[in-house]
């Protein structure tokens, strides 16, 4: 990065201005590419705005530089090659930004002056929340959705129609008699805070990288190559503008919003019409106050001249309209010091770093803790090793530094001065490090490789599908780790696992805290007397707590009748445990809570192995015949994959010396050759890597599991990790001393269901979803969560939604719950 002067624009020379303009333009263009093109920004919005404002200030003082750089008139970033291109009939432009009340007054005065409006004539302006999401254009023809596209560079966007059709809030057809024949709707795709938290929880559970914020999650979800991934994430949409229209349903912006509402499009309810600067600022203050309670991210208020006739007269300048302006909120951030970094062990074994801060007020709330997400975040890199922080300089209000050698690193250390961000109810996070304030004795934080809760190894699993380490480091203690203990026990006794009746969360908590049950085998060693003592002690403690809180005396001793009922309940618990001394093998496997092993995978493993000792021996054999890193890494390269890897191996083993030459067995495309050369440097380097991969092929014991479509390489790696820990093996063997497994009976050979795919949707009134699934599988059917051309039957209850549309689209038969039960009875 070229060095730039940090002096005020008013003091720099023309030569300094030209150099700064060139560097800033290139830098902004790169940040646009990362933000809009890759959904992976490395600086905050505030830092980006600071860069833009400095560029604009330079262009204002040196007009000959305006329009000469890469960023002066640019909007967004070039559309990705991964998607088909869509040229916007009307460009999707950006907005100018304002941060101070005075700038709003200047905006209104500038508009009035341009239009020549007398002081006596009012100017109507709409004010609406600025949603922090991904811009989207929806094109309807004849009322039907035909195309959905991202903004891209403003002129050409990405075709994401298939993905957008999975968003519930985007109608397939517009309603009403006045819908234009061509109606291009502009708006924002976003995620609510609650949905964002749920998505990140699923990401963490799966050992995948967490999304940094709802905007990144929404953008990443919308720009998936697989629409089913988009469909699994509850994206939302607000409509707020129009592109090409064959006829206009309104003459004002406020009228257009009303028309959109009539058409069935979601619009933001906090949009209002103002007739003075005072009203505009009052609405801005009101929305700023409500910001934390909206349930989704906004970063300001957008003002638009209400009249379309006046908008047309005002026109555009550079990359933005003269008739609109974004009034940005001040970032909810503060600068403080990290006093310590602590590790919390999550219920799934994840090691979660937490920064203990010198207390500081952020957005009106005193903050003393902030999340550091994971090990890579502490180190200041993403999964690919790319820096995610740039370091900041205080002089310009947290703007990107241009005078710091980034090789010093922007990792997070104890003693660092850091910028803390807080948005709504989201846990505060450490966003950046002030490198110039780093203490001389600050040392890089060493992430623990031993679980602080149980002393087991903590590892980052290698993902054989991607060739990368998972972002989360996890404890391998599994069944013996106290931090995971209660949750694993709750899973063990749950309905879909061993299904031990009567053992709910309260029972498990009581037994765990009393020290009676620490691992699953302990459940089968329970005796009446200690079990009763633990339950009675828990009841008395809760009674005393309630009495203290209410000021009343604790409840009297139990009568003989109540004591008898209590004894009966305890005997029922013990009987429920005894009833599970013999269990189906697949339930036993699922109950162990092995990462990546869900119900379907447990059933697949139960087909492969007759019992647990055979499974454990099979996993040990697979571990001894795992592939080497070169074999895995070759397929993990962009544009290569397993099929091309096998062709490369075949070519190398056939004695071909230049694997990149035309006419070889490898049959490589230009893009694949480029990826291989980028990874290995030269044709000789490529051949050397392929030859190493040949020697690192996995053995049959490994492929027996990894090549099975119902198990796969990722699950195989997880099984190897689990059973490589001696304490996990000991816990399973202790359990097998108490429990006997049996193979599940083969599915009934019912011609009506065998080999068919069934989907359940809506509310089922006469059975639970689990019961429905179990019944279908017992009769030989496969139960799927989504409808496709391969689906044979959809069972729909009340409230069925998009799956019904999908069934109609693919011509899949749809029946009611009653019809399904009749078919089951007949089978």
From Swiss-Prot:
GO molecular function, one term: DNA binding
CDD domains reported in the protein's UniProt record: BRCT_DNA_ligase_like, LIGANc
EC number: 6.5.1.2
InterPro entries in alphabetical order: BRCT_dom, BRCT_dom_sf, DisA/LigA_HHH, DNA_ligase, DNA_ligase_AS, DNA_ligase_CS, DNAligase_adenylation, DNAligase_N
Keywords, in A-Z order: DNA damage, DNA repair, DNA replication, Ligase, Magnesium, Manganese, Metal-binding, NAD, Zinc
EC category name: ligase
Reactions accelerated catalytically: NAD(+) + (deoxyribonucleotide)n-3'-hydroxyl + 5'-phospho-(deoxyribonucleotide)m = (deoxyribonucleotide)n+m + AMP + beta-nicotinamide D-nucleotide
Cofactor: Mg(2+); Mn(2+)
Pfam families: BRCT, DNA_ligase_aden, DNA_ligase_OB, HHH_2
Assigned GO CC terms: cytosol
BRCT domain ranges (all copies): 748-827
Gene Ontology BP annotations: DNA repair; DNA replication
Residues annotated to bind Zn(2+): 451, 454, 475, 481
N-terminal signal peptide: none
Active site: 130 (n6-amp-lysine intermediate)
Annotated NAD(+) binding sites: 45-49, 94-95, 128, 151, 188, 304, 328
Role this protein plays: DNA ligase that catalyzes the formation of phosphodiester linkages between 5'-phosphoryl and 3'-hydroxyl groups in double-stranded DNA using NAD as a coenzyme and as the energy source for the reaction. It is essential for DNA replication and repair of damaged DNA.
Matching PANTHER family: CHROMOSOME TRANSMISSION FIDELITY FACTOR 18, DNA LIGASE
NCBIfam families: dnlj, PRK07956.1
Family to which the UniProt record says this protein belongs: Belongs to the NAD-dependent DNA ligase family. LigA subfamily.
HAMAP family in the cross-refs: DNA_ligase_A
The protein, known as: DNA ligase
Organism of provenance: Methylobacterium sp. (strain 4-46)
